[in-house]
Amino acid sequence: MSYESGRSSSSSESTRPPTLKEEPNGKIAWEESVKKSRENNENDSTLLRRKLGETRKAIETGGSSRNKLSALTPLKKVVDERKDSVQPQVPSMGFTYSLPNLKTLNSFSDAEQARIMQDYLSRGVNQGNSNNYVDPLYRQLNPTMGSSRNRPVWSLNQPLPHVLDRGLAAKMIQKNMDARSRASSRRGSTDISRGGSTTSVKDWKRLLRGAAPGKKLGDIEAQTQRDNTVGADVKPTKLEPENPQKPSNTHIENVSRKKKRTSHNVNFSLGDESYASSIADAESRKLKNMQTLDGSTPVYTKLPEELIEEENKSTSALDGNEIGASEDEDADIMTFPNFWAKIRYHMREPFAEFLGTLVLVIFGVGGNLQATVTKGSGGSYESLSFAWGFGCMLGVYVAGGISGGHINPAVTISMAIFRKFPWKKVPVYIVAQIIGAYFGGAMAYGYFWSSITEFEGGPHIRTTATGACLFTDPKSYVTWRNAFFDEFIGASILVGCLMALLDDSNAPPGNGMTALIIGFLVAAIGMALGYQTSFTINPARDLGPRIFASMIGYGPHAFHLTHWWWTWGAWGGPIAGGIAGALIYDIFIFTGCESPVNYPDNGYIENRVGKLLHAEFHQNDGTVSDESGVNSNSNTGSKKSVPTSS
């Protein structure tokens, strides 16, 4: 190691290494060939270099010094020499490209391919709250992926939508139009009877001079016609300004020229019905219907026919022009990749009900057959009750997001009566449910065919012992009244509890938990109230397998059991019970106006419309009065109060 000094002699007297001597004041001096340094900064820097050298030496030799602390040095930023070059992102393990146009992206021959690859990978993000990866090109081929629907779904796995009745909506709009047509209810009206009116004595004198017979004098707006109402027969009377400006000579000449140009011997006009109104006419009507609240910001007030047209569009969107139609999707989404995709799009709701009911009946009928053909060793009454419950749960999960997962005609009819489910979808849903139950019973029967043959004693022997596993039949000692009310009570409990679980104003379960609770509800009804009649509570669950049973050996006798039980018991009891259960819940708990129980009368609608218009007027009138109050304060210094609603 060599040591330097600021003031060293030209030649060294000895080659002996210098020795350090530490003085009491902390200064370091060199003996023999080096003079003592008198500057503190030079000594400090020399000492620091020496300590750093010792630290490096200790690190190189593998040793460490615990008594000495090395100085901290800032980390140098590593500069990538290739930062300006295009570095393509290498896909992670398991990332493959199946399409031919994507296989070429694996080789990065030029910067353009790398840029395309980088853009491709940046688009592949997780969709929504799901952790599932969606390929960006998959999204291009499936535009509906991740798109939000703007249509109601009466699902049993989420709170029910709040849909207004079409007749009630039309009545609400009509009441609104009638209220706005009155002079005292128009926006911008300056009726003297209102608080905060800006009517002055000069206005009254001017109106009394030019008042026409048959007009109201209680409202200035009836004379001035500031609000251009639709269908007004009387032309508005324009008020002359107090300080009119004299027209110039040039203006008079222009007017006279126009009159000369437009003077013809023949006068003709086209009636309103002689041609269809064009887009320009509609725009001019809209401009005429513009209202100004503060003199600068125009506010467009929709025409009555426009309100009715919008309401018809909204209600038709809720009902759906066809089964499975969704109005929230763009025209690009309506292009289908193949022919079957188009069929599925228009029939996805019936398909969903079909699959949901099929899953329900497979589990339910399978549980019945397993407990019967094994003579209790393969199941019990409790196990078959849970089989029906979990089958119902899975059926709702299968169809809940598409059709709602009703899988029960009693539920569908109750939804149509009390929750404004479209009536034109009711028969389609019921037919799909019956067909799904038919195939579900057929699959369960085919699964247990060998066990049924062994239990019956031959392949051509079929009795009601196994037939009762496919369809319902009351016990022989149960009277018809008792059997009917068994189904009535069971279905009323089912539908009433469903209305409570699906009411967002009550205490709905968490997201996705409603179907699980419905499954436990069905199992509880079976274990507590299902022994005497095999708890039908679902007409489709009975009719579908009954039709199948009559076709495979049980014969028409399946329909004649217990005085045609399937008509008044399996269908009449559950449907009547479901309606009664929903009615009881709406009478005592539900407050939504979509239910016939809470349907508002004319007085309530007029009251609500009046309150809305009153609040709207005072909001606008308050703005105008504030502005006028500012102007008056500048002149008189008095404060003008804003009118308040009584």
From Swiss-Prot:
The gene is AQY3. The chain crosses the membrane at residues 351-371, 384-404, 428-448, 482-502, 510-530, 570-590. Residues 1-350, 405-427, 503-509, 591-646 are cytoplasmic. Aquaporins contain two tandem repeats each containing three membrane-spanning domains and a pore-forming loop with the signature motif Asn-Pro-Ala (NPA). One of its GO terms (cellular component) is plasma membrane. This is Aquaglycerol porin AQY3. PANTHER family: AQUAPORIN OR AQUAGLYCEROPORIN RELATED, AQUAPORIN-9. NCBIfam families: MIP.
